Design a protein with these regions (language model features):
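Carbohydrate transferase catalytic cores enriched for Leloir-type hexosyltransferases
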Residues: 1-368
Length: 368
């Protein structure tokens, strides 16, 4: 089978992680398949070369652009692919071969008020067109399957739940390595941690409000992954008015998953306050690194994390502050969460994700 994969979002956060890990497993066990990977100019050469069953094809189609429909359809036709996979909710409408599309979430539709005017309508339109065109629709969780059914009107008999996986890099790191990394990054030795984007639906305002309510003796610094925010950023202003600006630190840009694993391993508690998630990869990665997790129960988080995390509604900062305090003070509860988290995280592998995806490819070729 000659499989075309749209990899234009290779650098885009969680979707990029999905594409990269899926292709890594596919390339490692080609099983007679060939892969045509459609990439933007800046990503050419980023895939394994020697002995790889993957062929790179440059496309100039902007992500979520109108032109992507005919440019990608033409590229797929010229590459003679037997099946086309879009790893996000756009699909070239003129595509002639069987197609599979992955819908990671419909947050742009569910929380349209958090995005620029018209973004929600556009997202709904292109996602609905994509899932109607595709023979098989992949989703990360049962939560997203229900969203696809309710919001996009797709019968669930064409939808397959394919959970994401965790990279083998995410393991508990030795204390000496963690200490060295934290010193290099000028980060505190004990901290709460959040990893991910800072979009409004991530609900970081809840963490700021919870920090404000913590007793000073329990007010560990909060480390956010990525670069520092600008002083004028609404969250920076909120932290300033709450009197907790000095408690917030930033990891800076992380070079690879190994550094992220060190950041997870050093945290006293990982916190995930999201209003919605299609899966919830960062808290699962934190679990794999031996860090206890306090998470929102919204979206797919309850489904993904199960009983291995403390789950709370994403709305009451006082309740979050009390839970953060309790998890710092109660060593038995912490150890229990660590054990459960390590066990839970072992159930999610990219090999399983790839296997279920390949089964969906075969089903799509057989007519869906």
């Amino acid at each position: 089978m000659r499989i075309g994969v749209d990899a234009r979002k290779l650098r885009d956060g969680g979707i990029g992680t999905y594409i990269r890990n899926l292709l890594t497993v596919f390339f490692g066990r080609p099983e007679g398949h060939e892969y045509v990977v459609f990439l933007l100019q800046e990503d050419l050469g980023s895939l394994p070369r020697q002995g790889s069953p993957g062929e790179e094809v440059k496309v100039r189609a902007g992500k979520y652009s109108v032109s992507e429909h005919w440019l990608l359809a033409r590229a797929a036709r010229r590459a003679h692919v037997d099946l086309y996979h879009s790893p996000h909710y756009t699909l070239p409408l003129p595509i002639q071969c069987p197609a599979v599309v992955t819908v990671h979430d419909l947050i742009h539709v569910r929380f349209a008020r958090f995005f620029p005017a018209g973004a929600g309508i556009y997202a709904r339109t292109i996602a609905r067109a994509a899932v109607r065109k595709a023979r098989i629709v992949l989703v990360d969780s049962s939560h997203v399957r229900e969203d696809v059914r309710e919001i996009l009107g797709v019968s669930t008999d064409r939808v397959r739940v394919v959970p994401l996986g965790i990279s083998k890099e995410f393991t508990r790191r030795p204390a000496a390595e963690v200490e060295r990394f934290l010193k290099e990054r000028r980060l505190p030795s004990a901290y709460f941690l959040y990893v991910g984007a800072r979009k409004k639906h991530k609900n970081l305002a809840l963490l700021i409000d919870a920090l404000e309510r913590l007793p000073r003796s329990e007010r560990l610094p909060l480390v956010l992954s990525g670069p520092a925010w600008r002083p004028a950023h609404p969250l920076a202003q909120r932290a300033l008015h709450a009197g907790v600006s000095s408690c917030i630190h930033f990891s800076g840009t992380l070079n690879d998953e190994s550094e992220l694993a060190l950041l997870y391993s050093g945290a006293a508690l990982y916190v995930q306050p999201s209003l919605d998630e299609g899966f919830g990869l960062p808290p699962l990665e934190a679990m794999a690194c031996g860090t206890p997790v306090l998470s929102s129960s919204a979206g797919a988080l309850k489904e993904t994390l199960g009983e291995a995390a403390v789950l709370l509604p994403p709305s009451e900062p006082q309740i979050w502050a009390e839970a953060m305090t309790e998890l710092l003070q109660n060593s038995l509860r912490r150890e229990e969460l660590i054990r459960r988290g390590l066990a839970r995280s072992r159930g999610f592998t990219w090999e399983r994700t790839a296997q279920l995806t390949m089964e969906a490819y075969a089903e799509a070729l057989d007519g869906g």
